[in-house]
Regions:
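Charged, alpha-helical interface segments at or near domain boundaries
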Residues: 40-137
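N-terminal ordered "arm"
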Residues: 1-58
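A contiguous, surface-oriented mixed alpha/beta subdomain in the mid-to-C-terminal portion of proteins
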Residues: 115, 124-162
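Conserved aromatic-histidine-acidic binding/catalytic patches
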Residues: 2-10, 117, 152-158
Length: 162
């Protein structure tokens, strides 16, 4: 098993998914298959003794390719993937990877396949990020500093400061 690790930004996560997909399809060497790939966000709490770890840094052009590919499925799939990648959940990147395996196979029908655990998990992550974003937009309270600047202090769990 090969475990790909990445940082916290969208670019890092998108690049990591792209590189893991390349490895699974065996571009450049023998095909490993999607079952031999796992993606984790750093820092990693507990290492697997029998797995090989590969750190992936974000690359803007790869992240753009990833985004174009996901958008080609459907706008709803792209929104769900984007929001899920903003989640604070440690398994979100791997959940998106498993969802995209299904999404590229099924196309836009994946939007309605909530019986599948991969689709349901990404929908849950997306909904949680969307709800938290809405909550902070709705409940943000600003205070005036010297009647010149308004300041609001928020501490979201997910990366909702988009």
């Amino acid at each position: 098993m090969k475990i790909f690790t990445c940082g916290d930004s969208y670019e890092d996560k998108a690049t990591c998914i792209y590189r893991a997909w390349e490895y699974a399809l065996g571009l450049g060497q023998g095909a490993a298959g999607h079952g031999e790939v796992k993606i984790l966000r750093e820092p990693i709490a507990q290492l697997d003794m029998f797995a090989e770890y590969v750190h992936i840094d974000g690359e803007q052009d790869i992240a753009e390719k990833f985004t174009r590919s996901v958008r080609s499925i459907s706008p709803v799939v792209y929104r769900n993937v984007f929001y899920a990648l903003l989640s604070d959940c440690g398994e979100a990147v791997d959940a998106v990877y498993r969802y995209l395996i299904l999404a590229f196979r099924e196309g836009r029908r994946v939007e309605h396949m909530l019986i599948r655990p991969e689709a349901m998990r990404v929908m849950e992550l997306s909904r949680n990020v969307s709800n938290e974003s809405h909550k902070f937009r709705e409940m943000a309270r600003f205070t005036s500093v010297d009647r010149k600047v308004y300041v609001c202090h928020i501490e979201p769990k997910c990366d909702v400061s988009m």
